[in-house]
Amino acid sequence: MDYKATLNLPQTNFQMKANLVNKEPEMLKFWEEKEIYKKTLETRANAPTYLLHDGPPYANGDIHLGTAMNKILKDFVTRYKTMRGYRVPFVPGWDTHGLPIEHRVTTSLGEEAKKKSPAEIRKLCKEFALKYVDIQREEFKRLGVKGDWEHPYITLDPDYEYHILDVFKTLVENGNVYRGNKPVYWCPTCRTALAEAEIEYHDHESPSIYVKFQMVDKPDTYIVIWTTTPWTIPANVAIALHPDYTYVKIKVDEEYWIVAEGLLQKFAADVGIDFEVVEKFVGKELEGKLTKHPLYDRTSVVVLADYVTLEDGTGCVHTAPGHGEEDYQTGLKYNLPVLSPVDDEGRFTKEAGKYEGLKIWDANKVIVEDLKNNGSLIKAGKISHSYPHCWRCKGPVMFRATPQWFISVDKNNLRGKVLEEIKKVKWYPAWGETRITAMVQERPDWTISRQRVWGVPIPAVKCKDCGEVTLEPKVIEHFANIVKEKGTDAWFELDVNELIPADFKCPACGSKNFEKTHDTLDVWIDSGCSWEAVIRSKGERFPVDLYLEGDDQHRGWFQSSIFLSTAKAGTAPFKAVVTHGFIKDEQGRKMSKSLGNVIDPMEIVNKYGADILRLWVASTDFFDNIRVGKNIIEQQVEVYRKLRNTLRYLLSNLYDFTEADLLPYEKLLPLDKWALGRLQKFIEQITQYYEGFEYSKVYNATVKYCTTELSAVYLDILKDRLYVEAKDSIYRRSAQTALHYILEALIKILAPIIPFTAEEAYQESHLKRYESVHLEYWPEVRKEFIDEALLEEFDHLLLIRDDVLKALENARASDIIGHSLDAHVIIEAKNEELKNLLRKYESLLEEFFIVSKVTLSENISGLNGQFANVLVQRAEGQKCQRCWKYHPDTGKDLEHPETCPRCSAVLRGERK
């Protein structure tokens, strides 16, 4: 007889083959049509709000793996918090002004860009940005990221621009904004000032030269400086010495050179000289001494500075206040002239004399040659070092003194207030606090003006009569109200008299004759105002619960946001900050087109599905740098298959089960009580990991639970009961009750990580209380399901089971058995406690070990296990053709001559 029809074989439409690439778009359509995101807010309208504020990516290209990972991590948070019962609005945003976009537009125009008016360039920039907003929006949605995609915040929207100006007005009112002629990072290619957050450091080869400056009062004595920027020597006005260092005068041939004693040996070895020390003195003894400039007929004065170090060079620092922040500060102290004879394109101006018209990088060679010819050059070489580059064009930048607008970070103790706010924030990982604190402590004033057109104009006006440049709160407010209606294009389209209040007069001379200025705001101010434009002004809870971005944002968005929020609102804009590292390839190298190791996230999605990409994100310890490559993604495909098969097993064995079939805990079999107890521990552990943003631990614990605890133990053991026992028997319903709770918890736990698969499983299950799993609530830990004594007992039984499995494997290798059901296992536990435990659970040991018979015995000679001695023999009796177990009484039932007594009872309907 074919007994297959008498078994409760698994049934489900949840296929083993995922086919995510085709199914996921259908799921997205389902979520959209059913308005699931909107319903998550409606069903939790009266619940506490949890706000993760989205840091806006630049709308200047397709998403890359880093932006994909960032949005997926945010989606883990918002989906989890929604299931925890919070109202979780998520408004995605885009950064749409600034150099990255303008650079792309002007580069594509080539020479045509110079023929375009500012208004025309701005129109093209807007079109470009909005095009990529739409492209990125669809890409993020395809990743399964939920949010208010139809109503994102976009920094070029007039309402958003209004709030930028409103925050800026507060800073001006507070006196934190000033105009100064001081050195700033300047990109000669992009022809604009840059802030610290717009600087990248790359290796760069520079000249390395030692130059001697002749003392005016002692023509045979020279102070030796070292520099890697010969092009700044035309702007030199001083030489800085440390006041407390010991300096030496050394005799070299017929000359005397002055260098720091602490660098003497290194210097002498580098330039290859023999010398004799003739005098020692401290730096402050030379203060005020004059030297002759090596290129021009003027003098350079000796000044003192604490920043002089003994790391490199000579301890005598070439000082050009027009080309360095520290030099500038020293210049203020000594009232030195600020020379910066370089124009916007990095060419020398007429103030540089013979070098006029030369680009600074080309001038290096010419200046070194001139120094050599006039006898001032001691040695010239090359040095490879980390040098600042523009974040957009990737070219080297310079420090250049130009009139710019700045935010003073110390006025009104703003820096001090920000440092206090930093302490109140929870940082993940904890070192984030140390990092941003150090950056804030050391940062200079914020250069906020840009010599570009694609941005929010700084509404400063210049008096045509006296030349005074004025930035007044009432002008900003007047312009902001215009912007609310017409956007910032108004600055480029309207007459200046329409942009200022009718009664506004020049504070310096009383004139009403003005012209517009043309600087725009640093784009970091745009995004740094998002807390006001998107959250606070809309009446949402403030400060928000979380900012989550790459760890480069400690000097970017986190810093701009906390400075602006502290200045305007008196508080940090966030309660917690989570940062992630950067993506590297499988060898740990940075991803770059030149290495050919860039991975497009949409290629992964289109080949494997978004859930595979999301699973990879969950697998990473994202607080550090993250590796990815083909092999790593393939590993996730295999892990996904295991998770999917676990879900499939659970679903396929609950096909005839409803909540009406649930058994009360006290009626469950011991093994099922153990499974439910372990489930509660798992839920408790996973919840802690989700709360701490430890998704790699969620991933590892879930994979381990599914593969080790479920598939390799519990689910394997259950097959006999599920398939063979009577459909409605307590044996099967007890198992199904446990599977019900496991499936329910597992689907919910996986929902934030792999939302498509979780939804598919939910829709195929008997669990549907809502339209979508993403409207469900997080599984609660049910303490009544935890029997600590029973859990401890099964921990010991599992250890004995390991010994049994080893013995079975040995027996299989020795051809004593083929399948474990061929076995009769004889066990001798190694201590009295374990012997008593085996006696207590003797009736379930055959099921637990998946064998036909278990005998507890003494003094056996089998496998010497760690916890038990185990002897494996071939089971006696005939093999039951229904359950495949061996039993001495198989075949004695005339009605069912091929079955064991248990199966005969099931077939007769006698085993309930």
Curated annotation (Swiss-Prot):
CDD domains from the UniProt entry: Anticodon_Ia_Ile_BEm, IleRS_core
Reaction(s) catalysed (UniProt annotation): tRNA(Ile) + L-isoleucine + ATP = L-isoleucyl-tRNA(Ile) + AMP + diphosphate
GO cellular component: cytosol
GO molecular function, one term: isoleucine-tRNA ligase activity
Compartment(s): Cytoplasm
Positions bound to ATP: 593
Cofactor remark from the record: Binds 1 zinc ion per subunit.
Protein family: Belongs to the class-I aminoacyl-tRNA synthetase family. IleS type 1 subfamily.
Subunit structure: Monomer.
The protein's name in its UniProt record: Isoleucine--tRNA ligase
Gene: ileS
